[in-house]
């Protein structure tokens, strides 16, 4: 397998998802809503989920040449989700004995728009068979629509599991990730258990865009079901640890009477933890989002109270299996969401270790 790496220094639990998710995310099908509206999609998604959880079965169809894959990821952040995801993808592709060439570009989230645009156009010019990208901003959406309208390259959209309604007749090859609404609702349910009498809270968003809407607004919407919980403040960040620190300080200086902070990403949560320590407010609970290595270390240290842990490698494996199905001429589902588990600092190290072995079953391999 030929691998081309461009390093850019520019940056199984199922939860009941509210029927109001599509109200929070206007213009998108909620994950479960989509599967219910299109029953055959539900069948295909469940079949792919089974394959993801099982051992790989090598490709039996002959390939006349390697397939070409381009990857543009916002991987330069403390969260190791993207790097692990790609590692799991490549290892599963190798286990499936698929011949491929891959071109990778990692950038910072919410930055390097010019670099992303250049990399994306290069992927199209090289006539990649598959392009793995994400959708968070309006700029991303315009590029994706260009690909859907004018290219034979098959588009895999990472970190989104809510199909765009306007693309109904020309959906991407695959939406894949861990459903943000599902994870956020699981965290909301846990906070309600932790504060049965109610609580005041603040929200630290990711940068403006889809992820903040899906994680932050869904959480607020869910907490609003009870009048015992009061949102005191909400701040957008720059999706970095430094901005999480600054936003947490600003929030607590203006609205000190809070019981917990809901953070929409790893980097934001870790920055907020530093602010809580500096201000002597470690009595305030705070969550992570994703349950990667940095968050699990913070939970072990007692700095992070809880997180929703993605079974991280599920999505990398799902992308590889979807490509295998495509090569074999099988119908691929439109959307796939991996599994979650809620983890708290009260959980035993043994329990967390078992979850890590499941979540990182490929990406922890040498």
Curated annotation (Swiss-Prot):
One family name in Pfam for this protein: Peripla_BP_4
Main location: periplasm
Signal sequence region: 1-13
CDD domains in UniProt: PBP1_LuxPQ_Quorum_Sensing
Entry's transmembrane regions: none
InterPro entries listed in its UniProt record: Peripla_BP_I, SBP_2_dom
Keywords from the UniProt entry: Periplasm, Signal
Compartments in which it is found: Periplasm
GO MF term (any one): carbohydrate binding
One GO CC term on file: periplasmic space
Domain of life: Bacteria
Family, as annotated: Belongs to the bacterial solute-binding protein 2 family.
Function: Binds to an autoinducer molecule. This complex then interacts with the LuxQ sensor protein.
Name recorded for this polypeptide: Autoinducer 2-binding periplasmic protein LuxP
């Amino acid at each position: 397998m030929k691998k081309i790496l461009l390093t850019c220094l520019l940056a199984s639990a199922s939860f009941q998802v509210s029927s109001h998710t599509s109200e929070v995310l206007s213009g998108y099908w909620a994950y479960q809503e989509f599967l219910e509206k299109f029953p055959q999609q539900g069948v295909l998604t469940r079949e792919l989920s089974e394959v993801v959880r099982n051992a790989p079965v090598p490709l039996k169809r002959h390939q006349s040449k390697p397939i070409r894959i381009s990857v543009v990821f916002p991987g330069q952040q403390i969260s190791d989700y993207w790097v692990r995801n790609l590692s799991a993808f490549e290892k599963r592709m190798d286990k499936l004995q698929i011949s491929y060439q891959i071109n990778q570009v990692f950038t910072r989230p919410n930055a390097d728009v010019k670099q992303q645009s250049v990399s994306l156009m290069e992927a199209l010019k090289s006539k990649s068979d598959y392009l793995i990208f994400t959708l968070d901003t309006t700029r991303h959406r315009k590029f994706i629509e260009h690909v859907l309208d004018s290219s034979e390259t098959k588009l895999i959209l990472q970190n989104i599991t809510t199909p765009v309604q306007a693309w109904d007749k020309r959906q991407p090859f695959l939406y894949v990730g861990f459903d943000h609404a599902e994870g956020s609702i699981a965290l909301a349910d846990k906070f309600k258990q932790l504060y049965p009498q109610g609580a005041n809270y603040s929200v630290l968003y990711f940068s403006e865009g889809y992820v903040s809407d899906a994680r932050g607004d869904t959480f607020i919407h869910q907490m609003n079901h009870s009048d015992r919980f009061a949102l005191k403040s909400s701040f957008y960040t720059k999706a970095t640890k430094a901005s999480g620190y600054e936003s947490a300080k600003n929030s607590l200086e203006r609205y000190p009477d809070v019981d917990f902070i809901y953070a929409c990403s790893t980097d934001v949560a870790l920055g907020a933890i530093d602010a809580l320590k500096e201000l002597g407010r470690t009595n305030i609970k705070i969550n992570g989002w994703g349950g990667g290595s940095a968050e699990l270390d913070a939970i072990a240290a007692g700095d992070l109270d809880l997180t929703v842990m993605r079974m991280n490698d599920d999505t990398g494996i799902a992308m590889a299996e979807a490509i295998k199905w495509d090569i074999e001429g099988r119908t691929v589902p439109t959307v796939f969401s991996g599994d979650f588990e809620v983890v708290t600092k009260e959980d035993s190290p043994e329990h967390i270790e078992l979850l890590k072995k499941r979540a990182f079953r490929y990406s922890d391999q040498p």
